[in-house]
Amino acid sequence: MSSIYLHGLSRRRRIGSVIVAIYMLDSCGAFLSASGSGRYPGFSYRGLSVVTENIRSIHSSRRLKLTVNATNKEMYERQDSIHTLPLSPIPVMPSQLFQELALSQLELLANSIPCADRPGVSKIKTMALYLPQENVNTGQLEFLPAIHYPHPSRERVFIANEAASGVAPALPRTLTTLPGFAHATSLLPGYPMVSGGSEASVGVVEEVICDLTSGAAALSVPLFSGSRTVGVLLVSPSISKRRKGSAWTKEDREQVGRAGKSLSLALSMDTERAALQMQNDRAARALSDSLHQIKNPLQAMRTYGKLLQRRIADLGLLSNEGMTPQLLEMAEHLLVQSDRLADRLKPVDTIVDSLSERTPFVLNPAAPTKTQDSLVSLATPLVPWESETLEFARESKTSGELVIFMPTKKVAASGSNGPSNSTTSFSGNGSDVSTYTEDDGAGEMPSSLFSEMDLEMSFLSDVLDPVLAAFRAIAEDRGIMFSHDDTEDLPGVTICPQALQEALINVIDNAFTYVFLPKPGSRFGPNPSAEVRIRLVQNSKGSDAGVTILVEDNGPGIPAETRDQIFDRGKDQALDWTLRKHW
């Protein structure tokens, strides 16, 4: 196995297929990270760099593009298999507006503290704003570099070894800082005995040694929001250590303290804005879900009104009673009021869309998964986690089946004995739901998503009767053959009745929507004999005892390339277009 050689400014470079570890260093050579996860600002070391492109969170064997760049502008590109050290926490970055404000403030601070013996030259060499993060391994407070001044270039340092074990290679002796993020005590000498006031403020400006090559102490300023430490500003000098006394004057400390106060206020405001954005997102999701669930019974009401008109007219012709016109008028009023209610709900869609508009962030970290246990957000994250997938929908890591709602460990595989080509199964002790295709199989379930729902012992026939009755009326109006097979003496199950009703409504509604589409390869038009069938089947006894709900239809089924999108939030229109184009 070959290696990668990077020797300062020399022209000796050799690139091969290697297993490497990536290190990020600041402009002074201080160590910042031992992982390739996250999109970090660029850092340079001795004029030699490696630019990593499109890095989000790199796992073992993840392929990415490396560009090695030296001062002579010679470029080499190669696809290599990358193996990083255990994932470090992705930096929680503030908003773009705060970043621009902070850089302007730091530039102003640098220009306001000149060297006494060199007019026009700033006494400040570099500045960095660190954000707090808890170490998931030790539980101790660490600080992650978020904003740097001068604004770093895209240059990076790349150090590689041949070890496949993931053990970090030996660092060059010129590097003075050990791997890892900055521990709290290295930036705050008095930690944990630091405290703020009742509002945004700064702590005592102290000198800390963070670069042995310079010898001069840097200034450390803790930033507070009330009693909580929200960041640390580190200011490094551009001059060497004086023989006597400090490199910083009293005026310098006061100026740094004032800049820190401005950053503390801005950071507190940015944190509050992000928290409000998260609340806004939750409210938008809740409103969108509620609006969707309101439309389903509203549609059933309108269908009942139409059927009522037909029945009244038929009965009126048979009985010749004089009440028929009055009853028809009442049914007509029912339809009119249903239409009015539907019109009143249309502006709510606009409100939901406006609430869903987001302010762009510097970094949008991926949602935490089982393989990213080390990702930890702040108590009030500056960047909210994104998850476009509905909370009740997850994909099984073992079988690839889509699983919703319920937390039982396994799902019993069920075949389709009816006329349907697609089957959706709600299975387990009233607490599993999965989507099956013709090659259905069992898979492990994710952890429980029902922690905040009230579970109770119920009988499915009692819970589902209102739902099935509404769809019987809709099926009659649309010309769909709708049947319900119910096995006698089904056991009681522990469920959240309302949640199960809404889940079943969504699944049956989808079946009604797509059952008329022609089957693949069909030369005919819409499905002439649309059929939807509901079956309740008792599971085998044991740990999986319960009831399985099968929703079957004889429509075209779901194309394989779109099956992993059926529960994605906001994907319904795109999925509908794909289905209709596919057939």
From Swiss-Prot:
Keywords, ordered alphabetically: 3Fe-4S, Chloroplast, Iron, Iron-sulfur, Kinase, Metal-binding, Phosphoprotein, Plastid, Transferase, Transit peptide
Cofactor detail note: The 3Fe-4S cluster is redox-responsive, probably binds 1 cluster per monomer.
Region described as GAF: 97-277
Region annotation (Disordered) ranges: 412-442
One Pfam family of this chain: HATPase_c
Gene Ontology CC, one term: chloroplast stroma
GO biological process: phosphorelay signal transduction system
Sites of Phosphohistidine modification: 292
Transmembrane residue ranges: none
Cofactor: [3Fe-4S] cluster
EC class name: transferase
Catalytic activity: ATP + protein L-histidine = ADP + protein N-phospho-L-histidine
Family: Belongs to the chloroplast sensor kinase protein family.
Subunit structure: Oligomerizes.
Function: Sensor kinase that senses the plastoquinone (PQ) redox state involved in stoichiometry adjustment of both photosystems (e.g. long-term adaptation via transcriptional regulation of reaction center genes of photosystems I and II) and state transitions (e.g. short-term adaptation involving reversible post-translational phosphorylation of light-harvesting complex II, LHC II), thus linking photosynthesis with gene expression in chloroplasts. Reduced PQ suppresses its autophosphorylation activity.
Protein name: Chloroplast sensor kinase, chloroplastic
Protein source organism: Phaeodactylum tricornutum (strain CCAP 1055/1)
